[in-house]
């Protein structure tokens, strides 16, 4: 399924195991991986993710996404994931846990907001 719409993606993320985020095989900067991660998807992207560089670096360190330079490698990896449910489930779990920890942990968000308020000029 290829989707090129705005505003409908969460519906598709909920029914997908694997999500390829476009705008990343050309120098467009990639797309935000947070929504598919929190919806328990394996995230696959190309190398041009500079709009979300820090997030992707964290996800790569935690085995929560795949970044590919070549379409041929991408095809092989997708086939392997569908053949190995353990790897797919582990990646889905990693991406969801990482996203929950970094973006939806209320204690962490309060800490960040408090620090921003303390350093913000009046």
Label each PLM-derived region with a short phrase.
Residues 1-122:
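Nucleotide-activated sugar donor-binding and catalytic core shared by glycosyltransferases
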């Amino acid at each position: 399924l290829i989707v090129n719409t705005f505003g409908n993606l969460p519906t598709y993320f909920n029914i997908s195991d694997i999500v390829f985020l476009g705008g990343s095989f050309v120098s467009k900067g990639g797309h935000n991986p947070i929504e598919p991660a929190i919806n328990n998807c394996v995230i696959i992207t190309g190398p041009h993710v500079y709009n979300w560089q820090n997030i992707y670096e964290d996800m790569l360190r935690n085995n929560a996404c795949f970044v590919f330079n070549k379409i041929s490698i991408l095809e092989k990896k997708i086939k392997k994931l569908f053949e190995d449910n353990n790897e797919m489930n582990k990646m889905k779990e990693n991406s969801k846990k990482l996203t929950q920890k970094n973006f939806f942990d209320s204690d962490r968000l309060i800490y960040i907001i408090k620090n921003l308020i303390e350093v913000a000029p009046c």
